[in-house]
C-alpha cells in the first residue's frame, strides 16, 4: 500500500511539474506574441502616418498644379504667377519691338513698291522723265507707306484691347451715355473669346473682382468702334488723295502730248525751211557757174584776137 501511495504521490508531483512547465512555456509564448503584436501595431501606425502624409502632399501638389495648368477643349493653358511690374515691363518691350518691326516692314514695303513700279527703270531715258518718275514713285511710296502704317497702327491699337488692362481699369468714358445690352452680344463675345486667347486671359484676371462683366465688354466695344472709325476715315482720305493724284497725272499726260505735238510741228517747219535754202543755194551756184563759163569764153576770144593782131 505504501508503495502504491508513493507512486501516486510521484505521479501527482510529475503532473504538477509538467503543468508548471507548460504554464511557463505558454507564458513565454504569450509574451513573445504580445511583443510581436505590439511591433506590428507600431509598424502599421508608422505606415498609416506615412500614407496620410503622402496623401496630404499629393493633394497640395495637385491643387497647386490645377491653379497653374487649366485644361480646355482646345488644349492646356498654363498660368504662371507674374507680378504687375514684370507684366508692365514686358508690355513696354513688346511695344518697342512692334514699333521696330513695323518700321522695318514699312521700309521693306516701300523699297519693294519702288522696285516693282514700271516708271522706275524707264526714268533713265531722259532727265525730265527721270524727275517726273521720281516724283511719281515718291507719291506712290508715300501712299503705300501711309496705308501700311495705318493698318499696323490699327492692329496695334486692337491688340492693346486684348492685353492692356489699364484700358478697362483706367477708363474715363461715361458709360451711361451709351446704352449697352451685354446679353445681345453673347454670341459675338463667345466668338471673340474663342479666337483671342489674350482677351480671355485678361478678362479672367480682372473680372469680376476689379471690374464688372458688363462694363468690361461695354468698354471693349466702344474702344473697338472708335479704332475702326478712325481706320475708315483714314481710308477715305487716302482714296481722295489717290483720285486727286490720278486726275493730276491725266492732266500732265495731256500737257506732255500737246508739247510733243508742238515739238514735232516745229521740227517739220525747220526741215522744210532748210530744204528751201538748199534749193536756192544750188540755183545760185548754177548761175554763178554759167557766168564764170561765159567769162572764160570771152577771155579766150580776146587772147585769140591778140595773137591774130601780132
Curated annotation (Swiss-Prot):
Domain spans labelled BSD: 176-228
Q: Which PROSITE patterns match?
A: BSD
InterPro entries cross-referenced by the UniProt entry: BSD_dom, BSD_dom_sf, BSD_domain-containing
**According to the UniProt entry, which residue ranges have a biased composition of type Acidic residues?**
247-263, 301-310
Composition bias type Basic and acidic residues, residue spans:
15-26, 135-146, 264-276, 284-300
Query: What's a Pfam family this protein contains?
Result: BSD
Region of interest: Disordered: 15-45, 131-151, 240-310
One Gene Ontology cellular component annotation? cytoplasm
* PANTHER family from the UniProt entry: BSD DOMAIN-CONTAINING PROTEIN 1 (PTHR16019:SF5), SYNAPSE-ASSOCIATED PROTEIN (PTHR16019)
Question: What functional role does this protein have?
Answer: Acts in ubiquitin metabolism and is necessary for the control of single-copy DNA replication.
State the remark under miscellaneous.
Present with 3270 molecules/cell in log phase SD medium.
Q: What protein name is recorded for this chain?
A: Protein DOS2
Species per Swiss-Prot/TrEMBL record? Saccharomyces cerevisiae (strain ATCC 204508 / S288c)
The record's gene field reads DOS2
Amino acid at each position: 500500500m505504501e508503495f502504491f501511495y508513493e507512486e501516486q504521490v510521484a505521479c501527482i508531483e510529475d503532473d504538477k511539474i509538467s503543468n508548471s512547465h507548460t504554464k511557463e512555456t505558454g507564458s513565454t509564448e504569450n509574451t513573445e506574441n504580445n511583443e510581436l503584436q505590439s511591433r506590428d501595431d507600431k509598424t502599421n501606425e508608422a505606415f498609416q502616418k506615412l500614407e496620410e502624409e503622402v496623401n496630404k502632399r499629393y493633394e497640395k501638389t495637385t491643387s497647386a498644379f490645377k491653379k497653374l495648368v487649366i485644361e480646355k477643349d482646345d488644349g492646356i493653358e498654363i498660368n504662371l504667377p507674374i507680378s504687375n511690374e514684370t507684366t508692365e515691363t514686358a508690355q513696354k518691350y513688346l511695344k518697342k519691338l512692334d514699333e521696330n518691326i513695323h518700321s522695318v516692314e514699312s521700309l521693306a514695303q516701300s523699297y519693294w513698291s519702288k522696285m516693282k513700279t514700271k516708271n522706275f527703270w524707264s526714268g533713265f531715258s531722259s532727265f525730265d522723265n527721270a524727275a517726273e518718275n521720281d516724283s511719281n514713285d515718291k507719291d506712290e511710296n508715300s501712299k503705300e507707306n501711309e496705308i501700311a502704317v495705318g493698318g499696323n497702327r490699327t492692329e496695334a491699337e486692337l491688340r492693346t484691347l486684348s492685353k492692356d488692362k489699364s484700358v478697362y481699369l483706367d477708363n474715363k468714358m461715361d458709360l451711361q451715355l451709351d446704352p449697352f445690352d451685354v446679353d445681345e452680344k453673347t454670341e459675338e463675345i463667345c466668338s471673340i473669346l474663342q479666337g483671342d486667347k489674350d482677351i480671355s486671359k485678361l478678362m479672367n484676371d480682372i473680372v469680376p473682382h476689379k471690374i464688372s462683366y458688363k462694363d468690361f465688354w461695354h468698354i471693349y466695344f466702344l474702344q473697338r468702334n472708335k479704332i475702326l472709325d478712325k481706320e475708315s476715315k483714314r481710308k477715305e482720305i487716302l482714296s481722295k488723295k489717290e483720285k486727286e493724284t490720278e486726275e493730276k497725272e491725266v492732266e500732265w499726260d495731256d500737257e506732255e502730248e500737246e508739247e510733243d505735238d508742238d515739238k514735232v510741228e516745229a521740227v517739220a517747219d525747220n526741215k522744210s525751211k532748210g530744204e528751201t535754202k538748199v534749193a536756192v543755194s544750188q540755183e545760185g551756184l548754177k548761175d554763178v557757174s554759167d557766168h564764170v563759163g561765159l567769162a572764160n569764153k570771152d577771155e579766150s576770144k580776146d587772147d585769140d584776137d591778140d595773137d591774130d593782131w601780132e
